[in-house]
């Protein structure tokens, strides 16, 4: 191949000009390929009769001939210019590939004919896809077997075309530093019919074509009439318009992903930022993975000058779509990227500029290392652990970092090995798996913050069907980092009754760790009954004061979809019943269901946009003092599912009444957003089952109805069961809370 390449380089250096005879195609012979459109122009005169070929009137350089020989002769008469650029290794049938090696006798007059390399003495033919050194000229039947076995059988099929394997030196020859041209060595390879890329392995070529199909790039360059791009759809959410590409709900088929199911996530983050904007202004905000830019557009459109929004994305198509969406919402775009793109923002007459948005195109880790922000939101595809270190590197003091994790298969214990790989955590499927997932993410966030000498305060954590959202406030200093690191502990989980308790602090090895569990399953069941999960976040997951300010902002901006969820989070953080069974709550009062809602005027008194260094220091100290007060009232960890612990043959009480029964027994109790039938309480599992059994009624079948139950017999049965449960608890030495 090197000798052949050197022979081809000699006429390039001398730049010879030769006259190329262009034969007139006949019905019994193959057409001679036409020159490429981007090669030297060849003007052919009026064709003569078929017996005498007409030479071209314009001189053609020798390098242009080599480029013209790589074109398909079967498409020389095609009207489309893009169709003639297809490589000769891409054909429809095997016969078309064989025609490339066939040349009529009249074409052999000139030594510099287009297919002179394909002929040899004795009417032998050479392979059009192999150099002379690899496959010498041979007879037609032998060439047929060679093309069929070596090129056609290992081809890749796509839309009726076959991308055959090619052995020619197809890489362009580039001069080195001295100026000498050195031929590039390339083995067997394929040419992509869509993007003309060169792929070495067949499996890689299949994956390459599959990626084109997933992105909708099936309209390749050989199609004569290229179809117009499908129109973009405009969606509206929270008074913000966004253009979305086709297949916007499938990440594999679009460059700009938009998930309508994440609406609750976007509204929660908006209320978080709105509550933070009441403390200090202006805020440097970052949406590290913009996609369509819907989240950053909502920030800038509804919060105005209180925020300075930066939307980042590494995909060039997404950056272009973000800029278009900014203009659609009358927002000025400030472009900042490594490629130094410059685009003028032109507004139509009568339009008003609502604000500025900075759009960047770079890696999220690089951007967070270069600039400091007050608010950072991370929403990557899958896990977010790869971006936590850079997020806490330059975050300002008392700033907020929100993390959305969509790798629910690993967090919800469906792929336990992936959770161990990403989070360094050992988990199993439990009844409280959603809260377990939230504590796993918080533990990863806490470790990343501690590595940067920063601590965290968890404002709230939400785990729903499609995502896990964790929002934390950053506290600078090694003292805060040490306090945060102490809250990461292991969890002891009983596999029989699913009782759980955090392991005690200490470096000493305990002889019998089963003693820490309130249950007596280890003594009554054979073998090892408990496992160790974690490390997990063991402290509170909610900040009541911040959640109340979020509820106020949701009322102020009219976000009705998340008000019920925020109220549930508030009651869950306080661990108090949301309602009274006999007295209905009045939702018209400022105090809704036991939650006092601050107005906008009240929240301004807590603002931290103070003037002067001394005043700002005082407000910061007050803020930290208020945060410590909120953290002290921690809610009980984890919850119990009332259906999971129901008694066979008994009808459970209503969930509302059961919460009151637990509260009357002296336990803290509330519902949880993690599970619609879950109960968060500080009661141990044995007491939980005892109260559930006490107020359950027997199930009757047959002609009797459930309402005909004698109260005396019911109390007697419940008392007996409770006494037996208490006797077992006292015999096992269990601690009753």
From Swiss-Prot:
Superkingdom of the source species: Eukaryota
Binding-site positions, S-adenosyl-L-methionine: 266, 313, 363-364
Phosphothreonine found at: 24
Stretches assigned to coiled coil: none
A biological process from GO: tRNA N2-guanine methylation
Positions occupied by motif Nucleolar localization signal: 141-145
Compositionally biased tracts (Low complexity): 17-49
Phosphoserine carried by residues: 72, 616
This protein's name: tRNA (guanine(27)-N(2))-dimethyltransferase
